[in-house]
Amino acid sequence: MNLSSLRLESNPRWSYHAAHFPAHHGLNPSFRRNFVSCSSIKPSASSSLSVAESFTRDSASRIESLSQVSGVLGSQWGDEGKGKLVDILAEHFDIVARCQGGANAGHTIYNSEGKKFALHLVPSGILNEDTLCVIGNGVVVHLPGLFKEIDGLEANGVSCTGRILVSDRAHLLFDFHQEVDGLREAELAKSFIGTTRRGIGPCYSSKVIRNGIRVCDLRHMDTFPQKLDALLSDVASRFESFKYGPEMLKEEVERYKRFAERLEPFITDTVHFMNESIAKKKKILVEGGQATMLDIDFGTYPFVTSSSPSAGGICTGLGIAPRVVGDLIGVVKAYTSRVGSGPFPTEILGQGGDLLRFAGQEFGTTTGRPRRCGWLDVVALKYVCQINGFSSLNLTKLDVLSEFSEIQIGVSYKQIDGTPVESFPGDLCLLEQLKVDYEVLPGWKSDISSIRKYADLPKAAQQYVERIEELVGVPIHYIGIGPGRDALIYK
C-alpha cells in the first residue's frame, strides 16, 4: 500500500474532533479551525510563522555559541537520535561525558565514511580523535560490554587509549544483574515493565540498598570477594531459581581480577577531573541516555528507567554544580516512538503504525525490538521542556514524514467527559483514558534528505517545524533529515 494514499488513524481510544482548546496552549485564531475530526481541512501556507529569521546563523557560529558546559538530552521515550548530534558537536568540545544509565542506552552514529557504530556505554564523542570521553559516577558499567565496545572501536581504527575515563565511583553491573532482570520480569508476568534486560534496574537497586560494588573496589582484591559474596547471597535469597555456590564466586573473582587489570588505566576520579576541567575553561558536552519521559521521577512510572535522564541527572551523575550547566538541547523526533510497555497517548495502532515504523526503521539499537510509533505529542514535549529548561531543540527524522499527505500533532488532552487536562498527568489511570485532540497539517510529499538549508525545505515542512516551535515555545536550531552525519540543517 502506498503511504501517500493512507490516512493514518491513531489509537481509537482517543478521538479527533473540533473542540474548545484551553488558552494556555497559546494558539492563534488562524490555527483554531484546524483541530478537526478526520477532516481534510488544511491551514494555508500564509499562516506559517516566520520563526526562521530569528535563528539563521551558519553551523559554526551556532555550535560555537553554546555554553562551556552544554548538554544533549532525550525529550521523548528515547531513541530520538541524540548520538548523531553529540558526535557532530563533539568536534567543538574538549570532553564528552555520560552521566547516567548504562548499556540500555543505544546510540547509533556514523563516521565520515558512512560506517555505522552502535554504542551503549562509550560516549558518542569517541569518533572525534581530539575528544576525551568520560563515563561518570552516575553510570552503571558492565565491563564485558565496555571492553567489547572498545575492542570494536579499536578494530575499526578508532583509538581509545587515553581517551576514555571511567569514574571510580561508578557502580559495576554484573552478568547476574542481567539474569535478575529477567527473573523480575517473569515474576511481574502481565504487568511487566518492558525492560531491556541489561540489568540496569537490579544494579541501581543494589546501589540504593547499599550493597553495590563500585569501580574503585576493583583496586582492593583483598575485600572484593567478600563484597561480591554478600551481593550474590542476597540475590540467591531473593530468587529460588538463582543458583549460587562457592564455585561461582571463585570464577567471578578470578574473572574480575583480569578485568581490574585491564580497566586500571581508565579509572579516574572523574568528579575531580570534571571540576578541574571546568576551572581550566575546558568545554564539556554531556550526553544523556534514554530520555525525560523515562525518568524515574518524571516519566510514566513505573514504565521508566532507573536513573534520571533529565537535567538534574547531569549534576548528580557527574558531580558538578548546577550553576555551571548552561545550554541544554532537547532531541525530539518529528513523530513519537516508544519501546516496551506504558502509556502512549498518540500511538498509531495497526497498519498505520507499521508503515511509520518501517519508514523510520524503528527497531531498538539495544534490543532490536520493534518500537511503537505515533504522532508527535506536544503536551508531553511541553512538559519535558519545562522540566529541563531547554535553550533549543533538535528535531530529528523529519524526512520520515515525507511520504504522508497530511501530518497530525497531538496538541491537548481531555478526559472522557470532555474536561480539559491542563498538564501531562502523573496518574497512569488518567493518562491511559485520555482523549487527544489533534491538529492536522499538510504533508510535503517530496524527498528532503539532500536539503541542507532551511529556506530550501518545502513550505509545508517549514510550517510543521515552526508550528512545533510556536506550540512549545522553544526554538528548533537543528533539523535531522537522514541518518548520515551531514544530514543536518542548522536553523
Curated annotation (Swiss-Prot):
The gene is PURA. The active site is at residues 79, 107. This is Adenylosuccinate synthetase, chloroplastic. GO terms for cellular component: chloroplast; cytoplasm. It comes from Populus trichocarpa (Western balsam poplar). GTP binds at residues 78-84, 106-108, 371, 397-399, 480-482. Belongs to the adenylosuccinate synthetase family. Its EC number is 6.3.4.4. GO terms for biological process: 'de novo' AMP biosynthetic process; IMP metabolic process.
